From Swiss-Prot:
GO molecular function: rRNA binding; structural constituent of ribosome
Organism: Limosilactobacillus reuteri (strain DSM 20016) (Lactobacillus reuteri)
GO cellular component: cytoplasm; small ribosomal subunit
Function (record text): Protein S19 forms a complex with S13 that binds strongly to the 16S ribosomal RNA.
HAMAP family to which the protein is assigned, alphabetical: Ribosomal_uS19
UniProt keyword annotations, A-Z: Ribonucleoprotein, Ribosomal protein, RNA-binding, rRNA-binding
Family annotation (SUPFAM superfamilies): Ribosomal protein S19 (SSF54570)
NCBIfam families per UniProt: rpsS_bact
Family the UniProt entry places it in: Belongs to the universal ribosomal protein uS19 family.
Protein's recorded name: Small ribosomal subunit protein uS19
GO BP term, example: translation
A Pfam family assignment: Ribosomal_S19
Taxonomic classification: Bacteria, Bacillati, Bacillota, Bacilli, Lactobacillales
Top-level division of the source organism's lineage: Bacteria
Entry keyword RNA-binding: yes
């Protein structure tokens, strides 16, 4: 179930503040965040966010087609190591 349209999209206030601070400066630094639940706004395009995956911060460069999605969608939290191999070479 999606978010109600009357509420609008969500983004952490601290994240919006950090983006607004960097809009004035020429140098764009990586914005570190733990807010995976924040929606990507059009004002985020061109910025790099370091999104926390539970272990480390993974850099995500925001492009135009990412607008409307959540930051956490682009950083997986689980690493797949493969299924256990079924060793049938050793016979009885």
């Amino acid at each position: 179930m999606g978010r109600s349209l009357k509420k609008g999209p969500f983004a952490d206030a601290s994240l919006l503040k950090k983006v607004k601070e960097q809009e004035g400066s020429e140098k764009k630094t990586v914005i570190k965040t733990w807010s995976r639940r924040s929606t990507i706004f059009p004002s985020f395009i061109g910025y790099t966010f370091a999104v926390y995956d539970g272990r480390k911060h993974v850099p995500v460069y925001v492009q135009e087609d990412m607008v409307g999605h959540k930051l956490g969608e682009f950083v997986p939290t689980r690493t797949f190591h493969g299924h256990a191999s079924d060793d049938k070479k050793t016979g009885k």
